[in-house]
């Protein structure tokens, strides 16, 4: 079955909506995704060498959050046709008829411009340009092109979700470095294993709307094998901050243990029989992958603040 191309499939009801509530517009921002963006951007800002005025740092994080939300709104606007068909997304504001498509588009474009301009004026134009590119990459390159045209959609499009720590870093330094690239790679390499785990137990949904996710195109076996490869690469990237001097040996051990579990989960998915109705290993992999990424960046932050905390405790004692 192919994706419905008619942008007006919602009918007249979608274009003649009653006033939408603030909660509906907030949902357009994809708050769960935005929380991860904010957290990893904050990590990049804190881990970057140098200092930034706390007020400017707060403005930077808010602008990155708004930019992420804007790209989420644009994604929901464009994907309203397939969201209406998939059970996982059918209750989103546009397909459920709570917000008109044109209102979502205007909302996303306004927030995009606002976040980029304010970040440029308040912090620096390099980070603003990188934010603009991130929004464009997610809303246009991934959503409008890659998502519906290639099973590599998540692999390439995952770059959009990997930019936040680099954005936070750029807000402090005005540029990028090897360490910021490593932070980018942790998320970039993590994305395929994370999303393909979801795609495995949502194959029917993606197949119903014609989205060429890897399990639907290459099959379960090939997808599972590739998940192992990306899990191993993610593990290597996760321990890399220790080798570059960005983090201590304590973090290196912590990341290695978490990464070993991540890789084990990918092998557990590989052992799952094809056509398994419950797909419990894939669901566990998906759930753990979220905790894993939060834990890795939490570990980096804890490692960064550990010396200062130790000094404070020593002073008190």
UniProtKB/Swiss-Prot annotation:
It is an enzyme of class 2 (transferase). One of its GO terms (molecular function) is protoheme IX farnesyltransferase activity. GO terms for biological process: heme O biosynthetic process. Its main location: membrane. It is found in: Cell inner membrane. Gene3D superfamilies: UbiA prenyltransferase. It is a multi-pass membrane protein. Carbon 2 of the heme B porphyrin ring is defined according to the Fischer nomenclature. Converts heme B (protoheme IX) to heme O by substitution of the vinyl group on carbon 2 of heme B porphyrin ring with a hydroxyethyl farnesyl side group. This is Protoheme IX farnesyltransferase. The lineage of its organism: Bacteria, Pseudomonadati, Pseudomonadota, Alphaproteobacteria, Hyphomicrobiales.
